[in-house]
């Protein structure tokens, strides 16, 4: 299944969650798109709820189905709670951490920065968005990329970096200091529903 490239705002409204991380998609019309507007009601089955939760998380991190399932299966082989491990693996992706550090305004923008070779890990260029970052590794930008308008705008707009990261504004680089706790990850996601979906 290909990565979704349609209207992120419509998808956000349909799933009831901000996929860009800005929340702007739900400001004016916090209900699913369609002619019935806020009055439309549709009760989902158990399977429907599980599917919806999977889609919410998949679209939030911008993965296609194959990438998403591969990471889910990898999490199942780790010690600990399957769903939490899965969330941590998603959070440890390079594109996500570029976004978390404030070097990009959205994960989609962060993915483009990585794809175009602007991002470094421990001083070396890495152009693989799915690259798994380990605690202690340093994420930065190539020298010529530090003047990109999209980066400057993102840094100006960002006022928060997670406690499991650190950021040096002068060097425009940050570290993944530790794996996050579940309480530090998206509260609007019920990962157990995703585990149940793939266990059917």
UniProtKB/Swiss-Prot annotation:
Stretches assigned to coiled coil: none
A biological-process GO annotation: ribosomal small subunit biogenesis
Domain S4 RNA-binding: 92-152
InterPro entries given in the database record: Ribosomal_uS4, Ribosomal_uS4_bac-type, Ribosomal_uS4_CS, Ribosomal_uS4_N, S4_RNA-bd, S4_RNA-bd_sf
SUPFAM superfamilies: Alpha-L RNA-binding motif (SSF55174)
UniProtKB keywords: Ribonucleoprotein, Ribosomal protein, RNA-binding, rRNA-binding
MF terms in GO: rRNA binding; structural constituent of ribosome
TM regions (residue ranges): none
Domain of life: Bacteria
Any one GO CC term of the record: small ribosomal subunit
Region (Disordered): 20-41
A Pfam family reported for this protein in Swiss-Prot or TrEMBL: Ribosomal_S4
Function: One of the primary rRNA binding proteins, it binds directly to 16S rRNA where it nucleates assembly of the body of the 30S subunit. With S5 and S12 plays an important role in translational accuracy.
Quaternary data: Part of the 30S ribosomal subunit. Contacts protein S5. The interaction surface between S4 and S5 is involved in control of translational fidelity.
Family as reported in the entry's similarity comment: Belongs to the universal ribosomal protein uS4 family.
Protein name: Small ribosomal subunit protein uS4
Organism: Oceanobacillus iheyensis (strain DSM 14371 / CIP 107618 / JCM 11309 / KCTC 3954 / HTE831)
């Amino acid at each position: 299944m290909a990565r979704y490239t349609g209207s992120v705002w419509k998808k956000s409204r349909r799933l009831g969650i901000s996929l860009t991380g800005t929340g702007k998609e739900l400001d004016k019309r916090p209900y699913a798109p369609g002619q019935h507007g806020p009055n439309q009601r549709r009760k989902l089955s158990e399977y429907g709820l599980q599917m919806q939760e999977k889609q919410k998380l998949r679209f939030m991190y911008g993965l296609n189905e194959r990438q998403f399932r591969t990471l889910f299966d990898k999490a199942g082989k780790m010690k600990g709670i399957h769903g939490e491990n899965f969330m941590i693996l998603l959070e440890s992706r390079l594109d996500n951490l570029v976004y978390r550090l404030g070097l990009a305004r959205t994960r989609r923008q962060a993915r483009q920065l990585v794809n175009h070779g602007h991002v470094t890990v421990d001083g070396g260029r890495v152009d693989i968005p799915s690259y798994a970052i380990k605690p202690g590794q340093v994420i930065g930008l190539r020298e010529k990329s530090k003047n990109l308008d999209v980066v400057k705008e993102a840094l100006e707009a960002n006022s928060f970096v997670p406690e499991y990261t650190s950021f040096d504004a002068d060097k425009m680089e940050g570290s993944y200091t530790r794996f996050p706790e579940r309480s530090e990850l998206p509260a609007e996601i019920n990962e157990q529903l995703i585990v149940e979906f793939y266990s059917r």
